[in-house]
Amino acid sequence: MVFPDLLPRRSTVQPVRLMGDERLRLFSGSANPELAQLVARYLGLAPGPLVRKSFADGELYVQIQESIRGCDVYLVQPTCSPVNDSLMELLILIDACRRASARQITAVLPYYGYARADRKTAGRESITAKLVANLITAAGVDRVLAMDLHSAQIQAYFDIPLDHVYGSPVLLQYIKEKQLGDMVIVSPDVGGVSRARAFAKKLDDAPLAIVDKRRQAPNEVEVMNVIGDVKGKTAILVDDMIDTAGTISEAAKVLLRQGAKEVYACATHAVFSSRAIDRLSDGTFTEVLVTNTIPVPPDRRFPQLRVLSVADLIGEAIWRIHEDSSVSSMFR
């Protein structure tokens, strides 16, 4: 995995003004309208008008309220909680745009739900991440723009063009501005080593550590061991998402017991389900850094939380796709 170099700081980025280009339209699903509004602002647009409602039986209805015939349409809809409703709404939006004769439809997925079901771990299971890709493609989308997919193989689940962008620039920029000094980048499990290593390289090749969780014998509790030196250092735990926060919270406690000075949590997607808020706000972490790919309502926020915006990054990617320019050059 290769992470991009840092983008220009937000204060130095000039919004792309496309108001005069009537071919580009952006619409927001209900999953994260705040992010869609910020992306539209970067592009010098306003999200297109649409009607969305639910019938008494739970069925969804969507109608585009302006002509999009011949337009390049971008639909911003992370498939986050409620996952099934968000996914179904995206499919309906795609179908509505296709039937309205849009020239090209791009699904902008800041967060890709079902991403962890990317392989079979037991017999008679579904590979749901692939199924979701099939559904999105079958609905009529032409292209997908996704951010920080859980695993690289998901890109191959789509038989249409997919542009993969990263939330790491905004996280790295924040950490660099903190000037934390003696840092160690930590993967909370063995599976995330490549992500943590790429993150460390962008921080002047900071040292790397791994929290390895294993059972010493059958029927014994799992034991966490730290591979690497964390004593006296500021530990930064890096992952793609924080869901229940069980693994990352236990990893942080192990790091502190091993002598880490303080621990930061760093992830693109703030899923924050179950007991996540209690675990993240109990004083174990100095700060918890996430982005706004998934909305975090006020009642789910806590003093250690920092929510960083990826709207400019997504907006820049949309502009480059629309102009047939390179997206990958953003990350060189």
UniProtKB/Swiss-Prot annotation:
> Gene3D superfamilies under this entry?
3.40.50.2020
Q: Which residues bind ATP?
A: 57-59
Q: Name the active site residues.
A: 213
Which compartments is it annotated to reside in? Cytoplasm
State where Mg(2+) 1 binds: 150
Question: Which amino acids does the record list as binding Mg(2+) 2?
Answer: 189
Requisite cofactors: Mg(2+)
Which residues of the sequence carry a binding annotation for D-ribose 5-phosphate?
A: 215, 239, 243-247
Record protein name field: Ribose-phosphate pyrophosphokinase
Q: What is the lineage of its organism?
A: Bacteria, Bacillati, Cyanobacteriota, Cyanophyceae, Gloeobacterales
